[in-house]
């Protein structure tokens, strides 16, 4: 039996912030000979994305409870029980040595199913404040890790696993030394875009004129509107794309990033070594604010809560950063990154599987 490959089931779904770090760890362990399967839901992004990465996926039926009506909340225990039964049957077939919960609704019933079968549960919290599922699962987990300090008081801070092409970028001093001309501003609202960025940055461009050049990811369906907004203020020279497929190339091009502060975005920007203006999504637990705070505290970024994200404030901030200041900020961002996060998570999974 000892010669058989170890088996891991990754439980992650819903958003890229959960799925991409899970894929990074899965690929790392597969390269070491592990067998990996995925537990997800059929109607979210993991259903298409995970099989494209050569990983088999099993589905359970589960969705979030936040913001649902009374009827849905009353039905929740039965839905969770059914999802737990489905996950338990899947794990009985696959017989994983360990499960890795990377967040999303699927982790709840999946983690409970693993625990009920005596399978060790390893948790990774990507955000600076723990989600409800992970708060609950932490009570039964063998090990809990966190990307940023503060989500769990005693968990090891290991960073967020990020894509290898971002980690492979040249260091800031190598990449940015000798650059001149307009400051290159990369605007990223996530794959869905961000209306506040789409409305504000064309006006910022009008104020700053030829001192900046902008590459703006508008999000799905917004490219034409954003292009018109730039053209309407005489700034049609800037580049607007609906989606950026090669984020590593975009980071390599940029001098500074203006973006939301989802956990994976913050970790990628730190790993790339880039200054940033963060505009946290206004969630009631301020999750994105807490994600961005370590970089602001390190002197690598500036946080604008959405009401403060005005044309004047952003234009003044960008105008006030010299190339020397941007390089210093870039180096500070890189200094607080944890580039071996994938290895750290994979190593803990391996350790738990051996014990």
UniProtKB/Swiss-Prot annotation:
The keyword Chaperone does not apply. Keywords: Cell cycle, Cell division, Cell inner membrane, Cell membrane, Cell shape, Cell wall biogenesis/degradation, Glycosyltransferase, Membrane, Peptidoglycan synthesis, Transferase. Pathway: Cell wall biogenesis; peptidoglycan biosynthesis. Pfam families: Glyco_tran_28_C, Glyco_transf_28. It catalyses: di-trans,octa-cis-undecaprenyl diphospho-N-acetyl-alpha-D-muramoyl-L-alanyl-D-glutamyl-meso-2,6-diaminopimeloyl-D-alanyl-D-alanine + UDP-N-acetyl-alpha-D-glucosamine = di-trans,octa-cis-undecaprenyl diphospho-[N-acetyl-alpha-D-glucosaminyl-(1->4)]-N-acetyl-alpha-D-muramoyl-L-alanyl-D-glutamyl-meso-2,6-diaminopimeloyl-D-alanyl-D-alanine + UDP + H(+). UDP-N-acetyl-alpha-D-glucosamine binds at residues 15-17, 127, 163, 191, 244, 263-268, 288. Its EC number is 2.4.1.227. One of its GO terms (molecular function) is UDP-N-acetyl-D-glucosamine:N-acetylmuramoyl-L-alanyl-D-glutamyl-meso-2,6-diaminopimelyl-D-alanyl-D-alanine-diphosphoundecaprenol 4-beta-N-acetylglucosaminlytransferase activity. The keyword Nucleus does not apply. It is a peripheral membrane protein. One of its GO terms (cellular component) is plasma membrane. It is found in: Cell inner membrane. One of its GO terms (biological process) is cell division. Its main location: membrane. InterPro entries: GlcNAc_MurG (IPR006009), Glyco_trans_28_C (IPR007235), GlycoTrans_28_N (IPR004276). PANTHER family: GLYCOSYLTRANSFERASE, UDP-N-ACETYLGLUCOSAMINE--N-ACETYLMURAMYL-(PENTAPEPTIDE) PYROPHOSPHORYL-UNDECAPRENOL N-ACETYLGLUCOSAMINE TRANSFERASE 1. Cell wall formation. Catalyzes the transfer of a GlcNAc subunit on undecaprenyl-pyrophosphoryl-MurNAc-pentapeptide (lipid intermediate I) to form undecaprenyl-pyrophosphoryl-MurNAc-(pentapeptide)GlcNAc (lipid intermediate II). Belongs to the glycosyltransferase 28 family. MurG subfamily. HAMAP family: MurG. This is UDP-N-acetylglucosamine--N-acetylmuramyl-(pentapeptide) pyrophosphoryl-undecaprenol N-acetylglucosamine transferase. It comes from Salmonella newport (strain SL254). The lineage of its organism: Bacteria, Pseudomonadati, Pseudomonadota, Gammaproteobacteria, Enterobacterales.
């Amino acid at each position: 039996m000892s010669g058989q490959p170890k088996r891991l089931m990754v439980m992650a779904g819903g958003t890229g912030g959960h799925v991409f770090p899970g894929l990074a760890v899965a690929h790392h362990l597969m390269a070491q000979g592990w067998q990996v399967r995925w537990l997800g839901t059929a109607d979210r992004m993991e259903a298409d994305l995970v099989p494209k990465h050569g990983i088999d996926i099993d589905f359970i039926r589960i969705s979030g409870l936040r913001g649902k009506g009374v009827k849905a909340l009353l039905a929740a225990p039965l839905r969770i029980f059914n999802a737990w039964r489905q996950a338990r049957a899947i794990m009985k077939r696959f017989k994983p040595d360990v499960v890795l919960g990377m967040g999303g609704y699927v982790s709840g019933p999946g983690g409970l199913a693993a625990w009920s079968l005596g399978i060790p549960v390893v948790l990774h919290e990507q955000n600076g404040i723990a989600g409800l599922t992970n708060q609950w699962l932490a009570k039964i987990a063998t090990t809990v890790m966190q990307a940023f300090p503060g989500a769990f008081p005693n968990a090891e801070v290991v960073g967020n696993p990020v894509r290898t092409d971002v980690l492979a970028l040249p260091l800031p001093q190598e990449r940015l030394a000798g650059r001149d001309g307009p400051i290159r501003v990369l605007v990223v609202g996530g794959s869905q875009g961000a209306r506040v960025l789409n409305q504000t940055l064309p006006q910022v461009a009008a104020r700053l004129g030829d001192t900046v050049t902008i590459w703006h990811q508008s999000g799905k369906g917004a490219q034409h509107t954003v292009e018109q907004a730039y053209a309407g203020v005489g700034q049609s020279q800037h580049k607007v794309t609906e989606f950026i497929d090669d984020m590593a190339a975009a980071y390599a091009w940029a001098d500074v990033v203006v973006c939301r502060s989802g956990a994976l975005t913050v970790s990628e920007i730190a790993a790339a070594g880039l200054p940033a203006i963060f505009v946290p999504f206004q969630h009631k637990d301020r999750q994105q604010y807490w994600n961005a705070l370590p970089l602001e505290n390190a002197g690598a970024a500036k946080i604008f809560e959405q009401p403060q994200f005005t044309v004047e404030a952003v234009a003044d901030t960008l105008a006030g950063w010299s190339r020397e200041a941007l390089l210093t900020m870039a180096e500070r961002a890189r200094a607080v990154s944890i580039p071996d996060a994938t290895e750290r998570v994979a190593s803990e999974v391996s350790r738990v599987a051996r014990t």
